[in-house]
From Swiss-Prot:
Reaction(s) this enzyme catalyzes, per UniProt: cyclo(L-tryptophyl-L-alanyl) + dimethylallyl diphosphate = preechinulin + diphosphate
EC nos: 2.5.1.-
TM helices/strands, residue ranges: none
Protein name (database record): Reverse prenyltransferase criA
Gene: criA
Amino acid sequence: MTSYTESSEESGSRMPSEILTSYYDYPTHDQESWWRDTGPLFGRFLKGAGYDVHTQYQYLVFFIKNILPSLGPYPARWRSTITPTGLPIEYSLNFQKNSRPLLRIGFEPLSRFSGTAQDPYNKIATADLLNQLAKVQLHDFDTQLFNHFMNDFDLSRAETEALQKQGGINGKSTVRSQTAFGFDLKGGRVSVKGYAFAGLKNRATGIPVGQLISDSVRKLEPQMHCWDSFSILNDYMEKSDGWNEYSFVSWDCVDIERSRLKLYGVHNAVTWEKVKEMWTLGGRIEEDATIKAGLELLQHMWSLLRIDEGNRDYKGGFAADNGGKTLPIIWNYEINKGSPHPAPKFYFPVHGENDLQVSKSISEFFSHLGWDDHARQYPHLLRQIYPNQNISLTERLQAWISFAYHEHTGPYLSVYYYAAERPPWGSDQVK
Protein backbone atom coordinates (compact mmCIF):
# COMPACT_ATOMS: atom_id res chain seq x y z
CA MET A 1 0.00 0.00 0.00
CA THR A 2 1.39 3.40 -0.96
CA SER A 3 1.41 6.29 1.46
CA TYR A 4 -2.14 7.46 2.02
CA THR A 5 -0.79 10.86 3.03
CA GLU A 6 0.48 11.41 -0.51
CA SER A 7 -1.76 13.62 -2.64
CA SER A 8 -2.27 14.17 -6.32
CA GLU A 9 -2.12 17.91 -5.68
CA GLU A 10 1.14 19.61 -6.49
CA SER A 11 3.26 20.70 -3.57
CA GLY A 12 2.33 24.15 -2.40
CA SER A 13 -1.03 24.24 -4.18
CA ARG A 14 -4.12 25.31 -2.31
CA MET A 15 -6.29 22.65 -0.73
CA PRO A 16 -9.86 22.20 -2.01
CA SER A 17 -11.26 23.41 1.31
CA GLU A 18 -9.26 26.64 0.99
CA ILE A 19 -10.57 27.25 -2.52
CA LEU A 20 -14.16 26.64 -1.43
CA THR A 21 -13.67 29.01 1.50
CA SER A 22 -12.69 31.74 -0.95
CA TYR A 23 -15.53 31.27 -3.43
CA TYR A 24 -18.54 29.95 -1.55
CA ASP A 25 -21.13 32.54 -0.49
CA TYR A 26 -22.48 31.28 2.83
CA PRO A 27 -26.19 32.03 3.31
CA THR A 28 -25.85 32.78 7.04
CA HIS A 29 -23.17 33.96 9.43
CA ASP A 30 -23.67 30.78 11.48
CA GLN A 31 -22.90 28.57 8.48
CA GLU A 32 -19.81 30.59 7.62
CA SER A 33 -18.57 30.34 11.22
CA TRP A 34 -19.21 26.61 11.41
CA TRP A 35 -17.40 26.14 8.10
CA ARG A 36 -14.32 28.02 9.28
CA ASP A 37 -14.31 25.96 12.47
CA THR A 38 -14.97 22.52 10.97
CA GLY A 39 -14.56 22.67 7.16
CA PRO A 40 -10.79 23.11 6.68
CA LEU A 41 -10.21 20.42 9.31
CA PHE A 42 -12.56 18.12 7.40
CA GLY A 43 -10.53 18.90 4.29
CA ARG A 44 -7.31 17.90 6.04
CA PHE A 45 -8.89 14.62 7.13
CA LEU A 46 -9.85 13.90 3.52
CA LYS A 47 -6.39 14.71 2.21
CA GLY A 48 -4.59 12.94 5.05
CA ALA A 49 -6.61 9.77 4.53
CA GLY A 50 -5.62 9.69 0.87
CA TYR A 51 -8.83 10.70 -0.91
CA ASP A 52 -8.03 11.99 -4.41
CA VAL A 53 -8.65 15.66 -5.15
CA HIS A 54 -11.86 15.05 -7.12
CA THR A 55 -13.35 12.99 -4.29
CA GLN A 56 -12.28 15.63 -1.78
CA TYR A 57 -14.33 18.23 -3.65
CA GLN A 58 -17.28 15.85 -3.85
CA TYR A 59 -17.38 15.24 -0.10
CA LEU A 60 -16.65 18.86 0.78
CA VAL A 61 -19.65 19.97 -1.29
CA PHE A 62 -21.79 17.29 0.37
CA PHE A 63 -20.66 18.69 3.72
CA ILE A 64 -21.48 22.29 2.74
CA LYS A 65 -24.88 21.49 1.27
CA ASN A 66 -26.16 18.93 3.78
CA ILE A 67 -24.30 19.11 7.08
CA LEU A 68 -23.39 22.78 7.43
CA PRO A 69 -27.01 24.03 7.39
CA SER A 70 -27.86 21.52 10.14
CA LEU A 71 -25.20 22.52 12.67
CA GLY A 72 -27.44 25.23 14.09
CA PRO A 73 -26.37 28.50 15.73
CA TYR A 74 -22.67 29.21 16.18
CA PRO A 75 -21.28 28.73 18.75
CA ALA A 76 -23.33 25.72 19.74
CA ARG A 77 -26.08 26.34 22.28
CA TRP A 78 -27.28 22.73 22.44
CA ARG A 79 -24.95 20.32 24.22
CA SER A 80 -24.89 17.19 22.10
CA THR A 81 -24.60 13.75 23.66
CA ILE A 82 -22.50 12.34 20.81
CA THR A 83 -19.12 13.89 21.77
CA PRO A 84 -17.21 14.40 25.04
CA THR A 85 -17.08 18.15 24.41
CA GLY A 86 -20.74 18.61 23.53
CA LEU A 87 -20.07 19.56 19.91
CA PRO A 88 -22.65 18.15 17.46
CA ILE A 89 -20.03 16.73 15.07
CA GLU A 90 -17.19 14.22 15.26
CA TYR A 91 -14.72 12.84 12.69
CA SER A 92 -13.31 9.33 12.81
CA LEU A 93 -10.92 7.21 10.78
CA ASN A 94 -11.29 3.47 10.37
CA PHE A 95 -8.17 1.36 9.78
CA GLN A 96 -8.03 -2.11 8.28
CA LYS A 97 -5.34 -4.26 6.70
CA ASN A 98 -4.07 -3.27 3.24
CA SER A 99 -6.39 -0.32 2.76
CA ARG A 100 -6.34 3.41 3.25
CA PRO A 101 -8.27 4.88 6.18
CA LEU A 102 -12.00 5.40 5.78
CA LEU A 103 -13.33 8.76 6.98
CA ARG A 104 -16.63 8.97 8.83
CA ILE A 105 -18.69 11.83 10.21
CA GLY A 106 -20.79 11.49 13.34
CA PHE A 107 -23.40 14.21 13.53
CA GLU A 108 -26.43 15.41 15.49
CA PRO A 109 -28.45 17.88 13.39
CA LEU A 110 -29.44 21.09 15.18
CA SER A 111 -31.49 24.17 14.43
CA ARG A 112 -32.09 27.55 16.01
CA PHE A 113 -35.10 25.98 17.74
CA SER A 114 -33.15 23.14 19.41
CA GLY A 115 -33.66 23.33 23.16
CA THR A 116 -36.19 26.15 22.96
CA ALA A 117 -39.87 26.06 23.90
CA GLN A 118 -40.69 25.37 20.24
CA ASP A 119 -38.46 22.27 20.13
CA PRO A 120 -37.21 21.33 23.61
CA TYR A 121 -35.89 17.90 22.54
CA ASN A 122 -34.52 18.68 19.08
CA LYS A 123 -36.99 16.99 16.73
CA ILE A 124 -37.21 19.62 14.00
CA ALA A 125 -33.62 19.39 12.75
CA THR A 126 -33.77 15.60 12.38
CA ALA A 127 -36.94 15.75 10.28
CA ASP A 128 -35.47 18.51 8.11
CA LEU A 129 -32.26 16.56 7.48
CA LEU A 130 -34.13 13.37 6.56
CA ASN A 131 -36.09 15.36 3.99
CA GLN A 132 -32.88 16.88 2.65
CA LEU A 133 -31.11 13.52 2.35
CA ALA A 134 -34.07 12.12 0.43
CA LYS A 135 -33.61 14.90 -2.15
CA VAL A 136 -29.91 14.07 -2.57
CA GLN A 137 -30.84 10.57 -3.77
CA LEU A 138 -28.00 8.78 -2.02
CA HIS A 139 -27.21 5.23 -3.14
CA ASP A 140 -29.37 2.65 -1.30
CA PHE A 141 -30.62 5.25 1.22
CA ASP A 142 -33.71 3.96 3.02
CA THR A 143 -35.57 5.45 6.01
CA GLN A 144 -37.64 2.43 7.12
CA LEU A 145 -35.59 1.74 10.23
CA PHE A 146 -35.18 5.43 11.02
CA ASN A 147 -38.96 5.80 10.99
CA HIS A 148 -39.35 2.63 13.06
CA PHE A 149 -37.08 3.72 15.89
CA MET A 150 -38.23 7.33 15.83
CA ASN A 151 -41.79 6.08 16.21
CA ASP A 152 -40.80 3.93 19.20
CA PHE A 153 -38.41 6.32 20.99
CA ASP A 154 -39.59 9.83 20.08
CA LEU A 155 -41.48 11.69 22.77
CA SER A 156 -45.17 12.29 22.25
CA ARG A 157 -46.66 15.65 23.18
CA ALA A 158 -47.93 14.24 26.49
CA GLU A 159 -44.53 12.70 27.25
CA THR A 160 -42.80 15.96 26.41
CA GLU A 161 -45.04 17.79 28.86
CA ALA A 162 -44.42 15.14 31.52
CA LEU A 163 -40.68 15.40 31.06
CA GLN A 164 -40.80 19.18 31.23
CA LYS A 165 -42.55 18.90 34.59
CA GLN A 166 -39.62 16.77 35.79
CA GLY A 167 -37.19 19.54 34.87
CA GLY A 168 -36.56 18.52 31.27
CA ILE A 169 -32.96 18.28 30.14
CA ASN A 170 -31.95 20.64 32.93
CA GLY A 171 -32.89 17.95 35.41
CA LYS A 172 -30.88 14.93 36.52
CA SER A 173 -30.40 13.37 33.09
CA THR A 174 -27.40 14.26 30.93
CA VAL A 175 -28.91 12.62 27.83
CA ARG A 176 -30.19 15.43 25.65
CA SER A 177 -30.30 13.75 22.25
CA GLN A 178 -32.95 11.56 20.64
CA THR A 179 -31.36 10.89 17.24
CA ALA A 180 -28.07 11.24 15.38
CA PHE A 181 -26.51 10.34 12.03
CA GLY A 182 -23.32 8.77 10.75
CA PHE A 183 -21.90 9.20 7.25
CA ASP A 184 -19.35 6.75 5.82
CA LEU A 185 -17.37 8.26 2.94
CA LYS A 186 -16.24 5.44 0.68
CA GLY A 187 -15.82 5.00 -3.05
CA GLY A 188 -17.34 8.35 -3.90
CA ARG A 189 -20.56 7.41 -2.13
CA VAL A 190 -22.11 8.39 1.20
CA SER A 191 -23.56 5.61 3.34
CA VAL A 192 -25.89 6.74 6.11
CA LYS A 193 -26.28 5.30 9.59
CA GLY A 194 -29.00 6.21 12.04
CA TYR A 195 -28.89 6.40 15.85
CA ALA A 196 -31.76 6.55 18.33
CA PHE A 197 -31.46 7.18 22.07
CA ALA A 198 -33.96 5.73 24.54
CA GLY A 199 -32.96 7.76 27.61
CA LEU A 200 -35.54 10.54 27.33
CA LYS A 201 -38.36 8.08 26.59
CA ASN A 202 -37.34 6.17 29.72
CA ARG A 203 -37.47 9.30 31.86
CA ALA A 204 -40.80 10.46 30.47
CA THR A 205 -42.60 7.10 30.70
CA GLY A 206 -40.78 5.18 33.42
CA ILE A 207 -40.41 2.20 31.08
CA PRO A 208 -36.93 0.66 31.57
CA VAL A 209 -34.45 1.34 28.78
CA GLY A 210 -33.85 -2.37 28.24
CA GLN A 211 -37.57 -2.97 27.77
CA LEU A 212 -37.91 -0.07 25.34
CA ILE A 213 -35.08 -1.44 23.21
CA SER A 214 -36.20 -5.06 23.48
CA ASP A 215 -39.80 -4.27 22.52
CA SER A 216 -38.63 -2.26 19.52
CA VAL A 217 -36.20 -4.93 18.28
CA ARG A 218 -38.82 -7.67 18.68
CA LYS A 219 -41.08 -5.92 16.15
CA LEU A 220 -38.32 -6.27 13.53
CA GLU A 221 -37.99 -10.05 13.82
CA PRO A 222 -40.17 -10.91 10.78
CA GLN A 223 -37.80 -8.97 8.51
CA MET A 224 -34.42 -9.02 10.28
CA HIS A 225 -34.43 -12.47 11.92
CA CYS A 226 -32.22 -11.22 14.74
CA TRP A 227 -34.18 -12.07 17.88
CA ASP A 228 -32.17 -15.16 18.88
CA SER A 229 -28.92 -13.22 18.73
CA PHE A 230 -30.43 -10.22 20.51
CA SER A 231 -31.81 -12.48 23.26
CA ILE A 232 -28.29 -13.61 24.19
CA LEU A 233 -27.25 -9.98 24.54
CA ASN A 234 -30.40 -8.95 26.39
CA ASP A 235 -30.06 -11.81 28.88
CA TYR A 236 -26.54 -10.66 29.74
CA MET A 237 -27.51 -6.98 29.92
CA GLU A 238 -30.50 -7.63 32.16
CA LYS A 239 -28.57 -9.87 34.56
CA SER A 240 -25.57 -7.51 34.72
CA ASP A 241 -27.69 -4.35 34.98
CA GLY A 242 -26.06 -3.19 31.75
CA TRP A 243 -28.85 -1.09 30.26
CA ASN A 244 -28.87 2.56 31.35
CA GLU A 245 -29.86 6.04 30.16
CA TYR A 246 -26.90 6.11 27.75
CA SER A 247 -27.94 2.97 25.85
CA PHE A 248 -28.89 3.50 22.23
CA VAL A 249 -29.51 1.72 18.93
CA SER A 250 -27.86 2.12 15.53
CA TRP A 251 -28.63 0.75 12.07
CA ASP A 252 -27.67 1.05 8.42
CA CYS A 253 -30.09 3.25 6.46
CA VAL A 254 -30.54 0.65 3.74
CA ASP A 255 -33.27 -1.85 2.95
CA ILE A 256 -34.38 -3.31 6.27
CA GLU A 257 -33.55 -6.91 5.32
CA ARG A 258 -29.92 -5.98 4.58
CA SER A 259 -29.32 -3.73 7.57
CA ARG A 260 -27.37 -4.53 10.71
CA LEU A 261 -28.44 -3.53 14.20
CA LYS A 262 -25.97 -2.23 16.76
CA LEU A 263 -26.70 -1.82 20.44
CA TYR A 264 -24.57 0.68 22.36
CA GLY A 265 -24.05 1.63 25.97
CA VAL A 266 -21.50 2.76 28.52
CA HIS A 267 -20.00 1.38 31.70
CA ASN A 268 -18.05 3.28 34.34
CA ALA A 269 -15.96 0.28 35.41
CA VAL A 270 -12.86 0.93 33.30
CA THR A 271 -11.05 -2.29 34.20
CA TRP A 272 -9.70 -5.17 32.18
CA GLU A 273 -11.86 -7.68 34.03
CA LYS A 274 -15.01 -5.77 33.07
CA VAL A 275 -13.84 -5.47 29.46
CA LYS A 276 -13.24 -9.23 29.29
CA GLU A 277 -16.63 -9.95 30.84
CA MET A 278 -18.44 -7.71 28.36
CA TRP A 279 -16.46 -8.98 25.36
CA THR A 280 -17.62 -12.53 26.12
CA LEU A 281 -21.13 -11.53 27.30
CA GLY A 282 -20.37 -12.79 30.77
CA GLY A 283 -18.87 -16.02 29.42
CA ARG A 284 -21.80 -16.84 27.14
CA ILE A 285 -19.69 -16.74 23.96
CA GLU A 286 -16.16 -17.17 25.36
CA GLU A 287 -15.56 -20.50 23.58
CA ASP A 288 -16.10 -19.01 20.12
CA ALA A 289 -12.77 -19.00 18.22
CA THR A 290 -13.31 -15.51 16.76
CA ILE A 291 -14.17 -14.11 20.20
CA LYS A 292 -11.01 -15.69 21.65
CA ALA A 293 -8.77 -14.28 18.91
CA GLY A 294 -10.26 -10.83 19.28
CA LEU A 295 -9.95 -10.87 23.06
CA GLU A 296 -6.23 -11.63 22.83
CA LEU A 297 -5.64 -8.63 20.57
CA LEU A 298 -7.93 -6.46 22.67
CA GLN A 299 -5.84 -7.21 25.75
CA HIS A 300 -2.66 -6.27 23.90
CA MET A 301 -4.15 -2.93 22.90
CA TRP A 302 -5.31 -2.35 26.47
CA SER A 303 -1.76 -2.92 27.73
CA LEU A 304 -0.30 -0.50 25.15
CA LEU A 305 -2.74 2.31 25.98
CA ARG A 306 -2.00 2.11 29.73
CA ILE A 307 -5.40 3.54 30.61
CA ASP A 308 -5.85 4.27 34.32
CA GLU A 309 -8.04 1.51 35.72
CA GLY A 310 -10.87 2.28 38.09
CA ASN A 311 -14.48 3.33 38.36
CA ARG A 312 -15.21 6.50 36.39
CA ASP A 313 -17.68 9.07 37.67
CA TYR A 314 -19.16 9.83 34.27
CA LYS A 315 -21.99 12.37 34.35
CA GLY A 316 -21.76 13.70 30.82
CA GLY A 317 -18.95 15.65 29.18
CA PHE A 318 -15.68 15.88 31.09
CA ALA A 319 -14.35 17.71 34.12
CA ALA A 320 -11.60 20.23 33.41
CA ASP A 321 -9.98 19.76 36.81
CA ASN A 322 -9.03 16.11 36.25
CA GLY A 323 -7.76 16.31 32.68
CA GLY A 324 -10.98 14.91 31.29
CA LYS A 325 -10.37 11.38 32.55
CA THR A 326 -13.98 10.73 33.49
CA LEU A 327 -15.08 9.06 30.26
CA PRO A 328 -16.41 5.51 30.58
CA ILE A 329 -15.99 2.52 28.32
CA ILE A 330 -18.42 2.41 25.42
CA TRP A 331 -19.57 -0.98 24.22
CA ASN A 332 -21.26 -1.95 20.98
CA TYR A 333 -22.77 -5.29 19.96
CA GLU A 334 -23.49 -5.84 16.28
CA ILE A 335 -26.34 -8.13 15.29
CA ASN A 336 -26.53 -9.47 11.75
CA LYS A 337 -29.33 -11.42 10.14
CA GLY A 338 -28.89 -15.08 10.96
CA SER A 339 -25.77 -14.62 13.13
CA PRO A 340 -25.64 -17.02 16.12
CA HIS A 341 -24.55 -14.33 18.59
CA PRO A 342 -23.72 -10.62 18.75
CA ALA A 343 -20.28 -9.39 17.66
CA PRO A 344 -18.66 -7.12 20.31
CA LYS A 345 -16.81 -3.87 19.82
CA PHE A 346 -15.14 -1.75 22.51
CA TYR A 347 -14.34 1.94 22.65
CA PHE A 348 -11.47 2.81 24.96
CA PRO A 349 -11.51 6.37 26.37
CA VAL A 350 -8.31 8.29 25.55
CA HIS A 351 -9.81 11.77 25.93
CA GLY A 352 -7.55 13.34 28.56
CA GLU A 353 -4.54 11.18 27.68
CA ASN A 354 -1.46 12.70 26.01
CA ASP A 355 -2.12 12.71 22.26
CA LEU A 356 1.47 11.92 21.28
CA GLN A 357 1.61 8.92 23.60
CA VAL A 358 -1.76 7.71 22.34
CA SER A 359 -0.57 8.00 18.73
CA LYS A 360 2.56 6.00 19.59
CA SER A 361 0.43 3.29 21.23
CA ILE A 362 -1.76 3.11 18.13
CA SER A 363 1.34 2.86 15.94
CA GLU A 364 2.74 0.06 18.14
CA PHE A 365 -0.53 -1.83 17.86
CA PHE A 366 -0.47 -1.50 14.09
CA SER A 367 3.07 -2.93 14.12
CA HIS A 368 1.89 -5.83 16.27
CA LEU A 369 -0.79 -6.56 13.66
CA GLY A 370 1.77 -6.40 10.85
CA TRP A 371 0.19 -3.25 9.43
CA ASP A 372 3.54 -1.61 8.78
CA ASP A 373 2.23 1.18 6.52
CA HIS A 374 -0.32 2.30 9.10
CA ALA A 375 2.27 2.00 11.87
CA ARG A 376 4.75 4.21 10.03
CA GLN A 377 2.28 6.81 8.86
CA TYR A 378 -0.10 7.33 11.78
CA PRO A 379 1.93 9.81 13.90
CA HIS A 380 2.61 11.89 10.77
CA LEU A 381 -1.07 11.75 9.84
CA LEU A 382 -2.11 13.14 13.22
CA ARG A 383 0.30 16.07 12.87
CA GLN A 384 -0.90 16.72 9.32
CA ILE A 385 -4.52 16.87 10.47
CA TYR A 386 -3.75 19.20 13.40
CA PRO A 387 -0.81 21.31 12.13
CA ASN A 388 -1.46 24.13 14.61
CA GLN A 389 -1.45 21.90 17.68
CA ASN A 390 1.56 20.55 19.56
CA ILE A 391 0.44 16.95 19.99
CA SER A 392 3.14 16.36 22.60
CA LEU A 393 1.14 18.71 24.85
CA THR A 394 -2.49 18.19 23.83
CA GLU A 395 -4.77 15.64 25.48
CA ARG A 396 -8.15 15.87 23.78
CA LEU A 397 -7.67 15.61 20.02
CA GLN A 398 -8.21 11.84 20.09
CA ALA A 399 -11.25 10.86 22.15
CA TRP A 400 -11.88 7.15 21.63
CA ILE A 401 -10.21 4.11 20.09
CA SER A 402 -12.57 1.33 19.06
CA PHE A 403 -11.66 -2.27 18.31
CA ALA A 404 -13.60 -5.14 16.76
CA TYR A 405 -12.56 -8.47 15.30
CA HIS A 406 -14.38 -10.34 12.54
CA GLU A 407 -13.85 -13.89 11.35
CA HIS A 408 -13.29 -13.02 7.70
CA THR A 409 -11.78 -9.51 7.83
CA GLY A 410 -9.81 -9.70 11.07
CA PRO A 411 -9.03 -6.63 13.23
CA TYR A 412 -10.99 -3.44 12.74
CA LEU A 413 -9.80 -0.28 14.52
CA SER A 414 -11.19 3.25 14.52
CA VAL A 415 -10.02 6.49 16.12
CA TYR A 416 -12.46 9.28 16.98
CA TYR A 417 -11.29 12.89 16.90
CA TYR A 418 -12.18 16.41 17.97
CA ALA A 419 -13.81 18.02 14.94
CA ALA A 420 -13.21 21.76 15.24
CA GLU A 421 -10.39 24.29 14.93
CA ARG A 422 -11.25 25.80 18.30
CA PRO A 423 -9.26 24.09 21.05
CA PRO A 424 -11.35 21.68 23.15
CA TRP A 425 -10.29 23.44 26.33
CA GLY A 426 -10.28 26.94 27.81
CA SER A 427 -12.86 29.70 27.96
CA ASP A 428 -14.47 28.91 24.60
CA GLN A 429 -15.23 25.31 25.59
CA VAL A 430 -18.74 24.16 24.73
CA LYS A 431 -20.51 23.90 28.06
